[in-house]
A protein has these predicted regions:
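PLP-dependent aspartate aminotransferase-fold enzymes
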Residues: 88-102, 106-202, 206-207
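Conserved active-site segment immediately N-terminal to the catalytic lysine
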Residues: 36, 255-272
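Conserved small/polar residues in nucleotide/adenosyl-binding loops
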Residues: 278-285
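Active-site core of PLP-dependent enzymes with the aminotransferase class I/II
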Residues: 216-235, 246-253
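N-terminal entrance/gating region of PLP-dependent enzymes' catalytic architecture
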Residues: 16, 39-124, 130
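Short gly/pro/ser/thr-enriched loop/turn and capping motifs at secondary-structure boundaries
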Residues: 174-175, 247-249, 268-273
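Charged, compositionally biased N-terminal leader segments and the immediate start
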Residues: 1-16
């Protein structure tokens, strides 16, 4: 618990004091805080009961209490998937990056891109994405897979010369990816056609801005998307392939399949869930001037 000396320190240094409050209330014409609140806050949103707040605690006591609460958690295995996979972070990364104070100290030397090796790190990241996807260029980078896919759709819209308002999205994409594309395209009045690419693409008889396919699908199935990519191109659309980068170590690259833009989350490579996900759209070189920059 907090001792009397600490309470005195709090009273002196954390205001406003009771005297300050009295002066301020007198200035605005109210007798008490309750009088002020009743005349400024609508009654219907006021709490009827007093807040149940325990006595103040020191930092150590608070940490002990939080740890005791956390021990009540039950830890289960995670089988959710859908773009989020638990992974083991290699010790070399933990030791040399996450535990290296040079990355998070308050003082940053001049030209941190050189002094801390950031430019080299980003260059290596981009080259790895290019190697895995087979694309000509890669950025470094965006946020999660859903955001990167929405950016790829935006890139396709900027490149579109058909004035189309239609976008095809495979129902095999992760649900959060589909939802984010809906949110980002709604202000532009674009029409989303969501369904099985093997059935729905052939029914579209007009130009589309782009088609978004998942490789592998959200449930893990691996299908050859080359025929669907060909159909998207016949409708003058850009083929966007949402990839599992780890799977691309064994599967055909998006470039070999004919995709125009590839996106995928790097969370698979030892990044704990809950951290920033670095995701890179890797379009053909001719689209480079229109692609989104790093975020």
């Amino acid at each position: 618990m907090i001792d009397d000396n600490s309470k005195e320190f709090i009273k002196r240094h954390i205001g406003p004091s009771e005297e300050d409050q009295s002066k301020m209330l007198q200035y605005v014409g109210y007798k008490s805080l309750e009088d002020l609140m009743s005349n400024t806050v609508p009654e219907k949103i006021l709490l009827k009961d007093d807040l149940k707040i325990d006595q103040p605690m020191s930092e150590n006591d608070a940490l002990k209490k939080l740890k005791s609460i956390s021990k009540k958690n039950k830890i289960f295995k995670n089988f959710i998937g859908m773009g989020y996979y638990n992974s083991i972070t290699p010790n070399v990364i933990l030791r040399n990056i996450l535990e290296n104070p040079g990355w998070y100290t308050s003082y940053t030397p001049y030209q941190p891109e050189v002094a801390q090796g950031r430019l080299e790190m980003l260059l290596n990241f981009q080259q790895s994405i290019i190697d895995l996807t087979g694309m000509d260029i890669a950025n470094a980078s965006l946020l999660d897979e859903a955001t990167a896919t929405a950016e790829a759709v935006g890139l396709s819209q900027r490149l579109d010369k058909t004035n189309s308002k239609k976008i095809f999205i495979s129902s095999n994409c992760n649900p959060q990816t589909i939802d984010l594309i809906k949110t980002r395209t709604n202000p532009f009045g674009l029409e989303l056609i969501i369904g099985d690419e093997k059935k729905e693409l052939s029914k579209i008889n007009e130009d589309i801005i782009c088609g978004v396919l998942s490789y592998p699908g959200t449930l893990g199935e691996i299908n050859d998307p080359s025929e669907s990519i060909s159909q998207i191109h016949k409708k003058n659309g850009k083929a966007i392939l949402v990839c599992d980068l780890l799977a691309l170590a064994r599967l055909k690259t998006p470039a070999e399949l004919g995709a125009d833009i590839a996106v995928g989350s790097a969370q698979r490579f030892g990044i704990p869930m809950g951290c920033l996900l670095y995701t890179s759209p890797s379009p053909r070189d001719r689209y480079g001037s229109r692609m989104p920059s790093s975020a």
